[in-house]
Amino acid sequence: LWDCRGETAWEGLVHRRCRMSPSSPTGGAAAPGPAAADGISIRQVERAGWELIQATVEVPVEGWYWRVTHELARRTSPPRPDAVENGTLTAPGARFDTPSGCVFYRLTDSDVVSWAQASGDRNPIHLLPGRAAEAGLSVGSGEVVAHGLLLGAISLALVQPSPSWQVGLVFIGSADVPASECGAEESWAMLAVDPVSGDITQGR
């Protein structure tokens, strides 16, 4: 995507799902997939006003090839008046009930910016307040969002490891992070992580 579109490759992208599983030993005779010249397979379709993207790659990790599949979406037309927008981890006004044993994490907008810079994710929804709302997410004009792999990394860091060697991350919503104003005390979003399931809930 970056090679084809440059900076615009990141505009408005929303991470929907990530699946990771071992496919074969790196020393085996089988060649890694997917069968693309650069080792990356990208599928794109247009549906109901959205561009849907699936990217698959295999990477070597500690003697195994791991197949990693990312599913992303980008709005291509304005939403209908009756359309249901992408949600957040906690709907506005909802009670913040968490299972017992949850681990709490304070996420600031500077954390989101640091993640975006370290990971090379130049998506403006992480960096510029208001851009997430323009991309179709249900957030305020003074907020940036954390979603996708940042939330997945927080979950994986705290959840109990799976014996199946498979990781499936489903990103059902974003965490709305208030942008701190210059000279004001730093604001944050409060996240609760279930250490058993890895589910993340956002407090208000």
Language-model segments: what does each one mean?
Residues G6-E7, R43-E46, P161-S162:
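Intrinsically disordered, low-complexity segments enriched in polar/charged residues with Gly/Pro
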Residues L1-P32, A133-G140:
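Hydrophobic, proline/glycine-rich low-complexity stretches
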Residues L1-W2, Q117, A153:
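Short, hydrophobic/amphipathic alpha-helical patches that form generic packing surfaces
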Residues A73-V145, Q160:
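Catalytic strand-loop segment that frames the active site of acyl-thioester-processing enzymes
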Residues R16-L107, S174-V177, C182-R204:
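HotDog/MaoC-like acyl-thioester-processing domains
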Residues H15-R17, H126, H147:
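Histidine-centered active-site/metal-ligand motif
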Residues A132-G203:
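Catalytic-pocket segment enriched in acidic/His residues
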